[in-house]
Amino acid sequence: TFAFNGGPGAASAYLHLGLAGPRVADFGPDGRDGAHARMVDNPDTWLAFTDLVFIDPIGTGWSRTVKPDDAKNFFGVRSDAQVLAKAIALYTAKNNRTSSPKYILGESYGGFRAVKVARALQHDQGIVPAGIIAVSPLLEGSL
């Protein structure tokens, strides 16, 4: 499962540390104690049924281009999807996962992005995703 968040700037850490990863941030019983948050094992980790690859597209989290001026090449809807599809294709080839089912998980704008990435995977990389998981997705909006 390839997971990414939305934008602008939202890293996949929220999916990793708040939902699917092996450890999650515990903010206390009321969920508001950020000053004393601690990492705990996640009894609901998705690792029980899928591999997880968290991706921060260019401009999100710590993901940046070597030359700051090159970032604009990644900020279009189509180019964003094509780059992520290529990254997924390279990852699966390098890690001998070409025959494994590939799920695309997107949160917020990532839900919109997931559909575009799935299409780019199919049309540009010859990879047919097994499914899309949309977490609180942006389904309609002006970009």
PLM ranges: what are they?
Residues A48-D51, S99-P101, V128-A130:
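Loop/turn elements at helix/coil->beta-strand transitions in domains of secreted/extracellular proteins
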Residues T1-N73:
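N-terminal cap/lid subdomain of alpha/beta-hydrolase-fold enzymes
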Residues P57, A130-L143:
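Active-site nucleophile loop of the alpha/beta-hydrolase fold
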Residues L90, K94, A120-D124:
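Active-site catalytic microenvironments for nucleophilic, acid-base chemistry
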